[in-house]
Regions:
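N-terminal secretory signal peptides that target proteins for export/translocation
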Residues: 1-3
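Bacterial N-terminal signal peptides
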Residues: 6-17
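Cyclophilin-like peptidyl-prolyl cis-trans isomerases
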Residues: 20-233
Length: 233
């Protein structure tokens, strides 16, 4: 009898162990490296934003981002890419399934995910043309931003209240602490989908952010994604 009990307990232990491993596997965040003309940037993608995660992975695997410019750079704010029209003429344009070119429903999870320095975010049209805040099919930006003090964050909160009205988010104490220590761009919180973050290469993001630009925020010297690849999934 004792032998049977031991066998049952051993099986239960193996089952529980397998479940734990499966759950851990589900929590593993995919990683992508962007090889740029300024250096490499590694990002991890949030599993809590599955629509954006899966779209980004699919586009990377199709080679969509290869040869694209960082076409919009705002010093002390962010760097943006993903416009197919900016592709290097020497790089072949991939043939994409139409489903990859459809807008993505918003997956906004504030304050879990915020516009801290290094945040990977989906670009989109403004609220007037896009009240549901659906994301661009392909374009994204990486936040560099700046560090804030309490007075500056108070002003940011007032600005958020004015621009978002009843939908305004609150900059919690935890969020404010991150903006004071790490930096970022809090005025976008609650309005755009944040679907990942930089894990390596934030200094490369800084170097791109510091690239001289013209009056249209376009870099005066081309900065491109040479290639992008999934390194873990």
């Amino acid at each position: 009898m004792m032998t049977h009990i031991k066998i049952i307990l051993a099986c239960l232990a193996l089952t529980c162990s397998s479940l734990v491993r499966a759950q851990d596997g589900d929590n593993i965040r995919p990683q992508v490296v962007l090889h740029t003309t300024k250096g490499d940037v590694t990002v991890q993608l949030y599993n809590e934003t599955p629509l954006h995660r899966d779209r980004f992975l699919a586009l990377v695997k199709e080679g969509f981002y290869n040869g694209l410019l960082f076409h919009r750079i705002i010093y002390g704010f962010m760097i943006q890419t993903g416009d197919a029209a900016t592709r290097d003429s020497l790089v072949e344009t991939p043939s994409l399934d139409k489903s990859l070119l459809q807008k993505i429903p918003a997956e906004i999870h504030y304050p879990m995910f915020m516009h801290k320095r290094g945040a990977l975010c989906a670009a989109r049209e403004g609220d007037g043309a896009n009240p549901q805040r659906m994301s661009s099919p392909t374009q994204f930006y990486i936040v560099y931003g700046k560090r804030f003090n309490d007075e500056m964050l108070d002003k940011q909160q007032l600005s958020i209240n004015r621009s978002m009205g009843e939908q305004a988010i609150t900059l919690t104490d935890e969020v404010r602490d991150i903006y004071k220590r790490i930096g970022g761009s809090p005025h976008l919180d609650g309005a755009y989908t944040v679907f990942g973050e930089v894990t390596e290469g934030i200094q490369v993001v800084r170097d791109i952010d510091w690239t001289p630009t013209d009056e249209n925020d376009r870099p005066t010297e081309p900065v491109r994604i040479v290639s992008a690849e999934v390194i873990s999934q």
